[in-house]
Amino acid sequence: MNIASGMNQMLAQLKATSDLAAGGNKPAAVAPAASQADFGQLLKSAVDQVNTVQQTANQLSQEFVRGNQDVELHDVMISLQKANVSFQSMIQVRNRLVTAYQEIMNMQV
């Protein structure tokens, strides 16, 4: 599972919960239980993938600094940018989760 599909599933679950809490009387259509993953597992998987990308970029940059002839500068720069993009994406997901939580907490019962 890649990061984007995991994040899309998390956002779909958040939207369904938000719609239900906002007064909808029917839950949104949900994927079959066999393919549906736990929200916590999806979030942990996405964080682990971001962490792996960052560690790989860090290892590549350290190898380049040590003078390893097999590691080229453009490979290091690409891996660092991939790590940056994945981290920024994770920050945006976190921001949306916090916003959704705040909206749910501010709803009147």
UniProtKB/Swiss-Prot annotation:
Cell compartments where the protein resides: Bacterial flagellum basal body
One Gene Ontology term, aspect cellular component: bacterial-type flagellum basal body
Pfam families for this protein: FliE
Key words, A-Z: Bacterial flagellum
GO molecular function: cytoskeletal motor activity; structural molecule activity
Domain of life: Bacteria
A GO biological-process term: bacterial-type flagellum-dependent cell motility
Name this polypeptide is given: Flagellar hook-basal body complex protein FliE
Organism: Nitrosomonas eutropha (strain DSM 101675 / C91 / Nm57)
Lineage, broadest ranks: Bacteria, Pseudomonadati, Pseudomonadota, Betaproteobacteria, Nitrosomonadales
